[in-house]
């Protein structure tokens, strides 16, 4: 297919940075960029990530963001292409929900997007997952898009999917998942 020309109101004035992770040359660049963005968010963080198996630094930064009043909303896939991943995702989702984040499970299939929007100001779009393997060992490439209009468009997609194709993780949902499912979350 053909690339679509940017005909948005901010065409030609967007600031886009490439954050390229090479395990040998720039091993921590994406990890540090994510932690910095989360740690400095003031109002809202919206995340879509299928492998929400969180390294401890990202987990800690998200919990601190919630504590300082940032609206943290995370969308994860209910289904996965890796068998063990759903248990770990559910465990991390539950822990963040208990800390005050809003967690949504996407029911429209496997949502493979990796997007983070911060304070309606900028967004990250790319290949990096928020897990230790992706942030420590894999070759990854993300774009940092410093543009309110683009971020707003991504937020609208997030809100549409959240409101039409997701269910929210609540204490009641967690309670009804049953003992065996929760035990598997804890083990893995």
Question: Which stretches of residues belong to each language-model region?
Answer:
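Charged, low-complexity intrinsically disordered terminal segments
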Residues: 1-188
């Amino acid at each position: 297919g053909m690339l679509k020309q940017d005909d948005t109101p901010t065409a030609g004035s967007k600031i886009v940075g490439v954050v390229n992770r090479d395990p040998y040359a720039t091993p921590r660049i994406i990890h540090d960029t994510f932690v910095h963005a989360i740690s400095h968010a003031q109002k809202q963080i919206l995340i879509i990530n299928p492998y929400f198996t969180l390294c401890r630094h990202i987990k800690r930064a998200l919990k601190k963001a919630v504590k300082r009043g940032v609206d943290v909303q995370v969308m994860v896939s209910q289904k996965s292409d890796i068998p063990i991943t759903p248990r770990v995702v559910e465990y991390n989702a539950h822990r963040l929900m208990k800390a005050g984040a809003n967690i949504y499970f996407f029911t429209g299939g496997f949502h493979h997007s990796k997007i983070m929007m911060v304070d309606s100001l900028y967004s990250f779009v790319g290949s990096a997952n928020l897990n230790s393997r992706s942030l420590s060992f894999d070759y990854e490439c993300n774009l940092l898009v410093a543009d309110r209009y683009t971020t707003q468009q991504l937020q609208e997609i997030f809100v549409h999917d959240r409101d039409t194709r997701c269910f929210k993780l609540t204490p009641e949902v967690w309670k009804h998942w049953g003992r065996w499912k929760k035990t598997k979350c804890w083990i893995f």
